[in-house]
């Protein structure tokens, strides 16, 4: 009679080859597997991660916080799954969502080493960006990449992101302050949400 009812949004997008959905508590082991398998591959592109990133127990508390962000609409953390949702092949995070007169957020993403070069991130981000623009009514999505990360720059350009600037010592990546190219995608036919 008195059951728990979650108000975490249920977002599950499908593409030709993927399921792109918000991560939840039951994904702890999948996320741990993804980060453990790709730890060395992702290291040059990400902030320093502690060991808990590679263990389900480390993801339990993190996912509780992520679910709160989902409820508040302040961030949306997507897992990129194979069609059977057995394995996470990548992640796409829309964070620091601001409404009001800005309606903007930041995009971060990564894909597992064995899945690179197949167009899967383009496929996933096309669906996730469409969701953020049409359902979350985001006008501006900002994404930044290190100048030597040609793959990321090419992906963002293909998605329609435009270069807006260059920031020195912008983010602490792999223990070093790194320069980044600043890009953004705006929604030309933006409409406010209800």
UniProtKB/Swiss-Prot annotation:
This enzyme catalyses: N-terminal L-alanyl-[ribosomal protein uS5] + acetyl-CoA = N-terminal N(alpha)-acetyl-L-alanyl-[ribosomal protein uS5] + CoA + H(+)
Gene Ontology terms: cellular component: cytoplasm; cytosol
Molecular function terms in GO for this entry? N-acetyltransferase activity; protein N-terminal-serine acetyltransferase activity; protein-N-terminal-alanine acetyltransferase activity
One of the Pfam families matching this protein, by short name: Acetyltransf_3
SUPFAM superfamilies found in the cross-reference section? Acyl-CoA N-acyltransferases (Nat)
Q: What is its main location?
A: cytoplasm
GO BP of this protein: maturation of SSU-rRNA; protein modification process; ribosome biogenesis
Q: Where in the cell is it found?
A: Cytoplasm
Protein name, UniProt field? [Ribosomal protein uS5]-alanine N-acetyltransferase
Species assigned in the record: Escherichia coli (strain K12)
